[in-house]
Design a protein with these regions (language model features):
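Periplasmic N-terminal accessory/gating domains of Gram-negative outer-membrane beta-barrel systems
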Residues: 63, 87-257, 263, 270-282, ...
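Outer-envelope beta-barrel architecture signal
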Residues: 116, 153, 191, 203, ...
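Transmembrane beta-strands of outer-membrane beta-barrel proteins
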Residues: 233-234, 265-269, 311-313, 453-455, ...
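A short, solvent-exposed loop/turn motif at the edges and junctions
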Residues: 54-55, 82-92, 391, 401-404, ...
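Transmembrane beta-barrel domains of outer membrane proteins
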Residues: 81, 108, 196, 235, ...
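Periplasm-facing N-terminal accessory domains of Gram-negative outer-membrane beta-barrel systems
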Residues: 2-4, 10-139, 211, 225-227, ...
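Glycine-rich (often Gly-Gly/Gly-Pro-rich) flexible segments and glycine-rich loop motifs
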Residues: 315, 327-398, 585
Length: 659
């Protein structure tokens, strides 16, 4: 999308990757106690954890109470190995570590020779946890095993108890000046939910520990390819101190990483119209075709050292949008014959200026207070004692009396195609073209565990009826939504000693959207539509000449013209975070801080070329008001920019004491 300024994140990603700045990903911790058969603690035991996917090994030594702790670990399956002179080697397999989990794995060593060994298999099941945090883990295999419309993890957030969907925000709807609920990937759920009664903007959304919130309505701006997600977790209560910025839930998505084995998949999901039913009120069945395709690939770049993982998903969607049943003017009405609208003409002429204008247009004297119509009325001069005079005695408005804009714009109001002067169609399609992909690089180096992650999502959505942006609900005035989301996170996890770990992370999120860019009806200047135009005139001054088009006109049941509320918004979030963990006896002390700088750049182009509203306030009929040129209201506003800047600094310290 050329309309958005962009940073060449890919080049920055490659450069920093070569420099070795990285991050190992958000994971959990494993601790436990080593004892002999009598229950006595065994000090100075050599404890090792081996990542079964990458072969990475970490080591620790038990203290005087026989305890060990690995305070910071990436999510993975692990093997625990314990050795001590005079005891048989102990080996425990299938230890599955999830995001933000704290597992307790104890071991009892048996007296014997080192040539003997004890192996215990956990079959990848969770073992006893030593964390007070409350939340649910949803594994990647669970997500890909259920049919999800749109293939988004946010559709599974309600599986957690205490979660309720929000109803105050509608995707792609302008909520206020400079505020809109954007849909990630064009039409996915941004995850605005209420957790344990908190407001929907009180939640934290993270991908690999990096902040990925859209900075206005606080939903997620990033939804990774479902096949690339290892798991996600919702923390709902008793968060650790490092999550103190938000009072709602903590939603953390962890993406897959490469391993010593090559693994990947290719997929294609097809949905079409074949089994769809026709809307009862529509003359035909709307089309629907959706293809979601892509794949993943991960493996070793250098065995036991450097690992990669990449993914791509494309979505192509064509969907016929049903207008529903829209009451429109009859063929008779469109000729100026108002016989079937007679019962609506129940008001009287208001104001001397309007009475003068009607007199000039109709060619006979009209007075203030004169009824527009009643059965048996005539066009005789009206007076306070008159009982027969009315404005439209023949219920016919000659073309010469129509307003100039009405003569030009009538052709854009659809004629009825259903009984009862109703228009309905599902022949016009909404289309979506979305491409998103990511690449992750992990490495075990002398500088620590290293990882880089880059995500890019581009989408274009064409909407035939952009009513959410003040556009028409009849054909001919489509608008497009354009979006791009990018995430780069870098970090390093270093182990300066057997009892200390330091994590550093930097991330950059850019989320850009152009919502409601007019397409249909653009390029028709206002002067050619019969309007007076230009400065120093009683007419319209176009404030956005590049989108000048057919004037927006709103009636009681339908509207025509280009949409009135285009919103261009780009958000930037820069985040720096550092955590330091130290094991001291039975205490695990963790301290750190986070700083992020948020930018919100918004251009709300609301009613840039004006909007006329006809609600029948003059004659009693919106269509008759339109023909005569008597709008209820006219709105126009200037460009409304908003540039928000926010700096956040948070520090914390926490001591987890194991009794």
């Amino acid at each position: 999308m050329r309309s958005f300024p962009q940073l060449s994140l890919l080049r920055l990603f490659l450069l920093l990757g070569l420099l070795g700045t990285s991050w190992a990903g958000v994971g959990g911790s494993i601790s436990g106690t080593i004892k002999d058969p009598s229950g006595a603690a065994i000090a100075q035991s050599a404890v090792s954890l081996v990542n079964t996917g990458t072969g990475a090994r970490q080591s620790a030594t038990t203290d005087g109470r026989g305890t060990y702790t690995f305070p910071v670990l990436p999510i993975a399956d692990y093997v625990l190995e314990v050795n001590h002179p005079g005891f048989k080697p102990y080996r425990r397999t299938g230890i599955a570590l999830d995001a933000n989990s704290a597992l307790r794995v104890d071991a009892v060593l048996q007296v014997g020779e080192r040539t003997d060994a004890i192996t215990v298999s956990d079959n990848a099941a969770h073992v006893e946890t030593s964390s007070s945090q409350m939340g649910e883990v949803i594994a990647g295999s669970m997500m890909t095993g259920v049919p999800l419309n749109g293939r988004s993890y946010t559709d599974l957030l309600a599986l957690q108890s205490g979660v309720a969907p929000a109803t105050s925000i509608t995707s792609s709807t302008v909520q206020d000046v400079g505020a809109s609920a954007f849909s990630p990937s064009g039409d996915l759920n941004a995850g605005n939910i209420s957790i344990n009664g908190q407001r929907e903007f009180a939640n934290s959304f993270m991908v690999n520990g990096s902040d990925v919130e859209e900075d206005v309505n606080m939903g997620t701006a990033i939804i990774p390819n479902l096949d690339s997600i290892a798991e996600f977790r919702i923390l709902t209560n008793n968060f650790d101190a490092e999550y103190g910025e938000y009072s709602g839930g903590q939603i953390n998505v962890i993406t897959k990483s490469g391993s010593n084995a090559f693994h990947g998949d290719v997929f294609e999901f097809l949905r079409n119209t074949n089994l769809d039913a026709r809307n009862y009120f529509s003359p035909s069945r709307g089309s629907f075709d959706q293809n979601q395709f892509g794949g993943t690939l991960g493996g070793p770049a250098t065995r036991n050292k450097i690992f990669f993982y990449s993914d791509y998903q494309g979505t192509r969607q064509t969907q016929g949008v049903d207008t529903g049943l829209i009451p429109v003017p009859s063929i008779q009405d469109r000729s100026g014959n108002l016989a079937d609208l007679a019962s609506s003409l129940v008001t009287t002429v208001s104001g001397p200026a309007w009475a003068t204008a009607l007199s000039q247009n109709l060619g006979y004297q009209i007075s203030v207070g004169e009824p527009y119509y009643f059965p048996g009325c005539t066009n005789t001069n009206y007076s306070a004692t008159s009982t027969t005079a009315c404005v439209l005695p023949t219920l016919q408005i000659p073309n010469s009396a129509w307003s100039a804009p009405a003569q030009h714009l009538l052709q854009y109001i659809p004629a009825p195609n259903q009984p009862g002067n109703v228009f309905s169609t599902s022949a016009y399609n909404q289309t979506l073209n979305d491409n998103k992909g990511a690449a992750r690089l992990d490495a075990s180096t002398p500088w620590g565990l290293i990882s880089t992650y880059y995500f890019l999502d581009n989408f274009t959505q064409n909407n035939p009826y952009p009513t959410a942006q003040g556009g028409a609900n009849v054909p001919g005035f489509n608008a497009v939504n354009l979006g791009r989301a990018q995430l780069l996170n870098l970090g390093s996890t270093k182990t300066p000693s057997a009892t200390a770990v330091n994590e550093f992370r930097f991330s950059y999120l850019r989320d850009s959207n152009d919502l409601g860019r007019p397409q249909g009806g653009v390029g028709v200047n206002l002067a050619s539509q019969g309007f007076q135009v230009g400065p120093n005139t009683p007419g319209i001054v176009p404030l956005s000449p590049q989108t000048e088009g057919l004037e927006n006109v709103v009636f009681n049941n339908y509207s025509i013209g280009t949409d009135t509320n285009e919103l261009r918004q780009s958000n930037n979030t820069f985040q720096w975070l550092d955590n330091f963990s130290k094991v001291v006896g039975t205490h695990t002390i963790k301290a750190g801080g986070e700083f992020h700088y948020d930018q919100v750049n918004t251009h709300a182009i609301a009613q840039f070329n004006g909007s006329f509203l006809f609600f029948g306030s003059q004659t009693g009929s919106d269509f008759v008001d339109f023909l005569l040129g008597a709008p209820t209201q006219y709105n126009q506003s200037q460009l409304q920019p908003f540039y928000g800047r926010n700096k956040y600094l948070g520090l914390y310290a926490q001591d987890s004491w194991r009794l």
